[in-house]
Amino acid sequence: ALCYKHEIEKTLRTPDYAGFQLLGLNDFPGQGSAIIGLLDVFYEERGYITSKEIRRFCGPTVPLARIPKFTYKNDETFHATIEISHFGSAALDSAKITYTIKDEYGKIYYKDISNNRTIPIGSCVQLGEVNYSLASITSPAKLNLEVCIEGTHFANDWDFWVYPAVVETNQGNVYITDTFNEKALETLASGGNVLITAARKITYGQGIVQQFT
């Protein structure tokens, strides 16, 4: 569902794009099974996303955001350019748009309101920008930017993550290696601690060349 969201939003942010087609929104049961649909094989909701949630990013009117990245340090500023794709029956007059940043517990860190906006029919309609210093986020946090048009069901949101720029680390008395070698054995035998980090750092045995046969 998240992949569909980003693909569809990318399309809606593209100027002069003629449209898009989604193929196979349900699970495919033939010639083996492909459990990859937003809906199950009976075209019923899977339980992890609802039709109401899908219409936030796939519908006649969709608020959009251009966000350079989704992971930040708290010495940075979150920036987003807000626009909208609107293909309803008429332009939206005197629209009141709210921008909110909150955490997963509902605490609001940022809120801004734009009043009396006229939203014409079309794509890439610019609404404004969001700039928020992340200095007040002192511990790792999952935040959410939501853009809503008051008095309508038109809304969309995006998650992003913030981490401290400086982290105090305590190495402790730990022997770190990528190979279970003699020193690791000696450290364990003497009651010490060993951390083996083998992921993509294996040095022992790299001299063996593998070939296809």
Sequence positions of predicted segments:
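A glycine-rich, often tryptophan-bearing local segment used as a flexible ligand/cofactor-contacting loop or short
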Residues: 180-213
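Beta-strand-rich interaction surfaces with strong enrichment in secreted/lumenal proteins
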Residues: 68-70, 114-120, 133-134
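Structural recognition of the beta-strand scaffold that forms the well-ordered cores
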Residues: 19-24, 176, 194-197
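Flexible loop/turn segments at secondary-structure boundaries
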Residues: 27-34, 108, 183, 202-204
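Beta-strand-rich binding/interaction modules
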Residues: 75-117, 127-131, 140-150
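Substrate-binding clefts and catalytic carboxylate motifs of secreted carbohydrate-active enzymes
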Residues: 1-94, 100
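Low-complexity, Pro/Ser/Thr- and charge-rich linker/hinge segments at domain boundaries
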Residues: 160-179
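Short, exposed coil/turn segments at beta-strand boundaries within extracellular/luminal domains
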Residues: 151-157
